[in-house]
UniProtKB/Swiss-Prot annotation:
Keywords: 2Fe-2S, 4Fe-4S, Biotin biosynthesis, Iron, Iron-sulfur, Metal-binding, S-adenosyl-L-methionine, Transferase. Its cofactor is [4Fe-4S] cluster; [2Fe-2S] cluster. Catalyzes the conversion of dethiobiotin (DTB) to biotin by the insertion of a sulfur atom into dethiobiotin via a radical-based mechanism. This is Biotin synthase. PROSITE patterns: RADICAL_SAM. [2Fe-2S] cluster binds at residues 98, 129, 189, 261. It comes from Ruthia magnifica subsp. Calyptogena magnifica. It catalyses: (4R,5S)-dethiobiotin + (sulfur carrier)-SH + 2 reduced [2Fe-2S]-[ferredoxin] + 2 S-adenosyl-L-methionine = (sulfur carrier)-H + biotin + 2 5'-deoxyadenosine + 2 L-methionine + 2 oxidized [2Fe-2S]-[ferredoxin]. Gene3D superfamilies: Aldolase class I. The keyword S-adenosyl-L-methionine applies. Pathway: Cofactor biosynthesis; biotin biosynthesis; biotin from 7,8-diaminononanoate: step 2/2. [4Fe-4S] cluster binds at residues 54, 58, 61. Belongs to the radical SAM superfamily. Biotin synthase family.
Amino acid sequence: MEELRNDWTLKEVEILFSLPFNDLLFQAHRIHRQNFDPNQIQVSSLLNIKTGACPEDCSYCSQSSKYDTGLEREKLMEIDLVLQQAKEAQDIGATRFCMGAAWRNPTDKSLAKVILMIQGVKTMGMETCVTLGMLTQEQAFILKEAGLDYYNHNIDTSKEHYSNVVTTRNFQDRLNTLESVQNANIHVCSGGILGLDESQTDRASMLRSLSNLRTHPDSVPFNLLVPIPGTPFENIEPPTESEFVRTIAVARIMMPKSVVRLSAGRTKMGEAMQALCFFAGANSIFYGEQLLTTDNPNINSDKDLFARLGINQKKVNNLQSV
């Protein structure tokens, strides 16, 4: 078994990225097999419980109030409707239900409503995850007391590149919230986005920041940017398929016991690319035809993909594996 490390240097990570592709994938797959069933995928479902009008200026995001993307603002969903969506997700095989709100940070009033959603989903026997923006330490403790399993808070990109992507917050703000979540003993879900005009060194730095947290994130989601018309990044050149797969492989090597999730952008990935990602160490996806405001493969398409690749869908929750 590989030793869990929290002391990676940037040079070490860059050396991993520079390995011949086949050597890198061989090393990543070996580590993946040591820690997980390589033919098993955990499935989550994501629901946007509050859409648009976010005051942040993330250059990639359709939900920012700073850009004209044609997205209509929607208020926080009613609890009954959220629970109905959770039940539908469970019926198609999702074991974790994630709820996202386009906020800079939740108000106490909004948080109280989200807590009722969390408690309702928990009664169904599903894992719960929310992404609500920045949290205070007190809010993190409140969410823990409510029974929250996971908190998603992506760092998006490297510390060095961050100000080129977002200016209404800084990289340390992200780390502060992750620290509050870890202090509350909530499982951390944190990853990034590829396709933000970042360099390979930026990808290496991002993975270094994630792996050098106090404890590794339990889940590490990777998004392939879906360019949104009206945002500053609408014409950004995407990474190549091999660059994306390399990032998955390096993440698996650096964080051997974390669940690595393919998130937004899978509609742009063919079967071979997804298969390479699974071989390199990805072992989770989101089910459902919509991820926040971007398209996602339909469920039957994913089931067919699993069947062709001989992949089994994880039937129970994932907490015992991380």
